[in-house]
């Protein structure tokens, strides 16, 4: 069926958005613990509201000093984001920080530490000894629409959000404040992006800024035009784009004073902008024994290599686990009719090339490292500003040989 005139929209938010503050805090705590003890088991949730931060969850770690220093870790990340004054609605130096972290459940730990394969089935392979930390299903996706093999709407929305933060932090637009959102609507014909239809940019700003005379033209020139100038997708027509800057009017009250924030509430922003399916599990604050995170990363790794190998123009891969089991209970590959090889053969090749047991994913992607804080904003996938192991194209030749 023709898709002429169909519009698809994705959004992004800046690191100063209340939910993203929480993701950043949770991942900063995770990184601090992993840096001191790579075997730390971490499940940390954060809530922010006016003048307060609450950090709760479960942890098992030998990193006593890092654990004791969590309050300072929290404050440092808030200040780095840019909330350093009550004039901005939040101050990392003076806000209240409440820590309520307990120990990891031994019932969960037993299934992770000694998987069903080792405990019941007598498996001798060390990688069979680590079970999945929970049941669940995870998706990965890749498409040849952008150099980073991401859907164009979310890729463009993230570029705009990153640019908003960049012009604030480097002083190009010093009156901007940390909270902000972007939204991109693109017109598609036969599943190909052809026209940039609408861009929405909402940003927190100082109280004395004139929206019509200052904010709107500045955002168009310093944010939108800069991103569009760098847009590699040459066939995208941006000549008639509708631009909406702060369409509600002034945006002075932002951050935790404007809205409470919570870890894990931006899972579509974190992944594929709604273009691909999502298994439901959030990422931030979770160590890689949690397959919600590590297996979703592995699925992106799989999907990206499949597309890069030329086996399909776009692919979505699902994996599923049972708690306490090492081997996945299911693997499903969808190529949307864009495959160059039989999808059954592609699925078989994936099974031969990628070891999707949790212990193997952690080993192959080297996940027991403090690499997670940068992922807390601007997406976990398709990043061009940081190097992430699940974005590497190291299995292309292996997949071609397996086919």
UniProtKB/Swiss-Prot annotation:
A single MF term (Gene Ontology): magnesium ion binding
Tree of life domain: Bacteria
Keywords: ATP-binding, Cytoplasm, Magnesium, Metal-binding, Nucleotide-binding, One-carbon metabolism, Potassium, Transferase
Binding annotation for Mg(2+): 19
Alphabetized Pfam families for the sequence: S-AdoMet_synt_C, S-AdoMet_synt_M, S-AdoMet_synt_N
Annotated transmembrane regions: none
Subunit annotation: Homotetramer; dimer of dimers.
Protein name: S-adenosylmethionine synthase
Organism: Mycobacterium bovis (strain ATCC BAA-935 / AF2122/97)
């Amino acid at each position: 069926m023709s898709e002429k005139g169909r519009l698809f929209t994705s959004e992004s938010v800046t690191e100063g958005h209340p939910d993203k503050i929480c993701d950043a805090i949770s991942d900063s705590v995770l990184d601090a613990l992993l840096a001191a003890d790579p075997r730390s088991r971490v499940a940390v949730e954060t809530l922010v509201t006016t003048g307060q931060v609450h950090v709760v969850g479960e942890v098992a770690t030998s990193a006593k000093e890092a654990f004791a220093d969590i309050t300072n870790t929290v404050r440092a990340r808030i200040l780095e984001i840019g909330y350093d004054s009550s004039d901005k609605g939040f101050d990392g130096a003076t806000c209240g920080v409440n820590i309520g972290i307990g120990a990891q459940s031994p019932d969960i730990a037993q299934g992770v530490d000694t998987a069903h394969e080792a405990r019941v089935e007598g498996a001798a392979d060390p990688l069979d000894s680590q079970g999945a930390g929970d049941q669940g299903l995870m998706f990965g996706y890749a498409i040849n629409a952008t150099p980073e093999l991401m859907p164009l709407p979310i890729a463009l929305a993230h570029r705009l959000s990153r640019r908003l933060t960049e012009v604030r932090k480097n002083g190009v637009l010093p009156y901007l404040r940390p909270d902000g959102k972007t939204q991109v609507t693109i017109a598609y014909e036969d599943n190909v992006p052809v026209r940039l239809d609408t861009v929405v940019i909402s940003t927190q700003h100082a109280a004395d800024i004139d929206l019509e005379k200052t904010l709107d033209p500045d955002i168009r020139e310093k944010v939108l035009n800069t991103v569009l100038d760098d847009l590699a997708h040459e066939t995208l027509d941006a000549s008639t784009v509708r631009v909406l800057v702060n369409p509600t009017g002034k945006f002075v009250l932002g951050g935790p004073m404007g809205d409470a924030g919570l870890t894990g509430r931006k899972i579509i922003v974190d992944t594929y902008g709604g273009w691909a399916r999502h298994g439901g599990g959030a990422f931030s604050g979770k160590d890689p024994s949690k397959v919600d995170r590590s297996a979703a990363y592995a699925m992106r790794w799989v999907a990206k290599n499949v597309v890069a190998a030329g086996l399909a123009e776009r692919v979505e891969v699902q994996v599923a686990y049972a708690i306490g089991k090492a081997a996945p209970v299911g693997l499903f590959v969808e190529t949307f009719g864009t495959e160059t090889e039989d999808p059954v053969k592609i699925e078989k090749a994936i099974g031969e090339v990628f070891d999707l047991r949790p212990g193997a994913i952690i080993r192959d992607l080297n996940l027991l490292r403090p690499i997670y804080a940068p992922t807390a904003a601007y997406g976990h996938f398709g990043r061009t500003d940081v190097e992430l192991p699940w974005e590497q194209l190291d299995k292309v030749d292996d997949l071609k040989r397996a086919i």
